[in-house]
UniProtKB/Swiss-Prot annotation:
Name of this protein: Cyclin-T1.1
Region (Disordered): 336-468
Gene Ontology BP, a term: positive regulation of DNA-templated transcription, elongation
Keywords: Cyclin, Transcription, Transcription regulation
Entry's family note: Belongs to the cyclin family. Cyclin C subfamily.
Biological role: Regulatory subunit of the cyclin-dependent kinase pair (CDK9/cyclin T) complex, also called positive transcription elongation factor B (P-TEFb), which is proposed to facilitate the transition from abortive to production elongation by phosphorylating the CTD (carboxy-terminal domain) of the large subunit of RNA polymerase II (RNAP II).
Acidic residues composition bias: residue spans: 458-468
GO molecular function, one term: cyclin-dependent protein serine/threonine kinase activator activity
GO cellular component, one term: cyclin/CDK positive transcription elongation factor complex
Organism whose genome encodes this protein: Caenorhabditis elegans
Length: 468
């Protein structure tokens, strides 16, 4: 294997290692297939493991500091570690969610974006079991599981952390072809399309990164309706095709086989597409009539990152809300409605059995303690009992006089017009005065102020129990 003079950190011009590239016959001898799984079942398990890795990284990246986020390269490296591990180990023996968490922890170290083990454990248990670890013993046991699986992955891949990704080759080829950046959207789409190739297929175990980049660019050119002869006009000769200078192992038969294989796989795994989700997130159309309930639900659907401390706890199962699927929201709503209905039926059964008091309000009022009659209420009568004192005459103002002059009659306020004006106006109803104010004509003469008693006639000097 020839090594470029550019250094070990730049895999752009190096031959891809053949240790982790297997033929079609060798791919039929994986550990899962030997234990009874079919080829389709194994591929579906790989796709679910890749989706779980993506979900875990989304949870860990819910931080404000961009330096603490796991990059796109770390995601693809974690996918590659998972594919290599499950070539020699079976899905029936190792849970893909546990292995996916260990791959994320290992990829963060190898790609210089490490995350704390406690953070990885917190997001892993929340994504796996929808609950948090509350005791120190449970945290230690979970940490031992992740560390043990990490050591198993390292032993399985023989400590080979050098992963070749097709993303670098895609950018390198498009940089040589599109020097003026006329096809920049095509390059961006092909870059994220390469992530789908690693996530939904097992090509990282069958083809080199250079071969995958050729197929990705060819498919993206066909998708964007760009002729490949025009795109690679400077690299096409009569003796060699357009891809000869970028990958010596590529042939027309191999290109056709890879394209058909990918289209069939990609069509059956539309829920795991990373490129389409990225494009929808970046180019999301504006909502004409947004639903406030959906916006609030999306705003509250925050990730379960341990760095986020302001996420409120759920009142149902005492855990942070985080990302709750639609099915789980429906189950919570139905459980709440069922609890309310069971409580209503229980009260009805107790009432029929005589356990609850079914008497009327008047009967209950008759059994109230007699001392309660000493309290003054607005509806109580003065049948020898305490009654509220009468209103002083100086505070009992008469109603305002109704002026019947010609001027006021002509200019009297119309109540209906006033209501229509306030209804059609844009002022908030909370600040609109009530129409009852205009049941009578406006008062022209202000009421006279009450006369205050002089200091000589004041009853402040009376003793307790004395009357005036």
């Amino acid at each position: 294997m020839s090594v470029s003079s550019r250094g070990a950190a730049s895999p752009a011009h190096r031959t891809a290692p053949t240790k982790w590239l297997f033929t079609k016959e060798e791919m039929k001898k994986t550990a899962s297939i030997q234990e009874g799984m079919s080829r389709e079942e194994e591929l579906a398990s790989r796709q679910m493991a890749a989706a779980f890795i993506q979900e875990m990284i989304d949870g860990l990246n819910n931080v404000k500091d961009p330096k603490m986020k796991i990059g796109h390269t770390g995601l693809c490296v974690a996918h590659t570690h998972m594919h290599r591990f499950y070539y020699l180990h079976s899905f029936k023996k190792y849970d893909y969610r546990d292995v996916g968490a260990a791959c994320v922890f290992l990829a963060g170290k190898s790609q210089e974006c490490p995350r704390k083990l406690s953070h990885v454990i917190s997001v892993w248990r929340e994504r796996k079991d929808r609950k948090q670890l509350t005791t120190e013993t449970a945290r230690n046991e979970a940490a031992q599981i992740i560390v043990l699986l990490e050591s198993m992955i390292l032993q399985t891949i023989a400590f080979d952390l050098n992963v070749h990704l097709p993303h670098i080759y895609v950018l390198d080829i498009m940089k040589k072809v599109d020097k003026k950046e006329h096809y920049r959207p095509l390059t961006s789409c092909a870059y994220y399309f390469a992530t789908d190739v690693i996530a939904v297929t097992d090509w990282s175990l069958r083809y080199s990164a250079a071969s995958m980049s050729i197929v990705i660019i060819h498919l993206m050119a066909a998708y964007a309706n760009v002729r490949i002869e025009r795109l690679f006009a400077d690299f096409i000769n009569e003796d060699s095709p357009w891809y000869a200078k970028f990958d010596e192992t590529m042939t027309n038969e191999k290109l056709r086989e890879m394209e058909v294989d990918f289209l069939v796989t990609y069509r059956n795994s539309c829920q795991f597409h990373h490129a389409s989700k990225f494009n929808f997130r970046e180019h999301r159309p504006m909502l004409e009539n947004p639903d406030v309930r959906k916006l609030d639900r999306t705003r509250d659907a925050r990730s379960h990152s341990p760095m986020v401390h302001h996420v409120p706890d759920s009142t149902v199962n005492v855990r942070p809300r985080a990302y709750v699927p639609r099915d789980e929201l429906t189950v919570e709503r139905l459980n709440k409605e069922r609890g309310v209905e069971e409580e209503r039926r229980k009260r009805e059964r107790d009432r029929m059995a005589g356990k609850l008091d079914s008497s009327t309000s008047s009967e209950k009022r008759a059994r109230i303690d007699p001392l309660a009659n000493n309290f003054v209420s607005s509806s109580s009568s003065s049948n020898g009992k305490l009654a509220p004192p009468p209103i002083p005459p100086q505070l009992n103002f008469p109603p305002p006089p109704i002026v019947s002059s010609g001027y006021n009659h002509k200019n009297q306020i119309n109540r209906k017009n006033h209501e229509n004006n306030h209804t059609n106006s844009s002022v908030s109803p909370a600040f609109v005065p009530s129409a009852r104010t205009f049941d009578v004509a406006p008062m022209l003469t202000p009421p006279t102020a009450p006369k205050l008693q002089s200091a000589d006639n004041s009853d402040m000097d009376l003793e307790d129990g004395e009357l005036e």
